[in-house]
Amino acid sequence: MIKTVALVSLSAGTIGEDFVKHEVNIGLKRLKQFGLNVKIMPHAMKGIEYVKNHPKERANDLIAAICDEEVDMILCAIGGDDTYRLLPYLFENNELKEAIEKAEKKKIFLGFSDTTMNHLMLHKLGFGTFYGQSFLADVCEMEDDMLPYTKKFFEELIKTGNIKEIVPSDVWYEER
């Protein structure tokens, strides 16, 4: 079902930093092993300071991902604490609403934490969202594989475009 994933940094620009380069490479490799094509949006990997100081570019990345007909899923890089700064740029001249209305196919938006605000605004505009994994925290897991619970639901989502039932994990992981 999901063939192409757009990777966006709507809050923190962590994935553009050298100290997570190894993790990012693991995550990109994993997405390809799932059979996915990955489009890294233009500003997603510009680093913490750039992303922090350019909310308009973050908003443009989201709108571009929505408008890109090859993209099936928009995956948030990580949470953060200032996604709210995108709002003026997303709702200026109804750009976000128009992008969603013009999109010829349904897409999935996936992320958590600071991304909660994005889920609400996208849901209100009729865009499908799943409060779930982020790229850095979940896909880039620095072990041989993703955590089994995380992987199960991620695979279900990319294979079917939906998750039937989320069952709580019987295992709790703190630090591995």
Question: Where are the language model's segments positioned?
Answer:
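ATP/NTP phosphate-donor binding region
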Residues: M1-E70
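Gly/Ser/Thr-rich loops at beta-strand to alpha-helix junctions
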Residues: S11-I15, I78-T83, L110-M117
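Conserved anion/nucleotide-ligand pocket segment
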Residues: G128-R176
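N-terminal small/polar loop signature for handling phosphorylated ligands or for N-terminal nucleophile
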Residues: H43-E104
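Short glycine-/acidic-enriched loop or helix-start segments at secondary-structure transitions
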Residues: E17, T83-L86, H119-M121, E141
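Short, acidic/small-residue loops that bind anionic groups at enzyme active sites
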Residues: L90-M121, G128-F135
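Short, structured coil segments at secondary-structure junctions
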Residues: F34, L125-G126
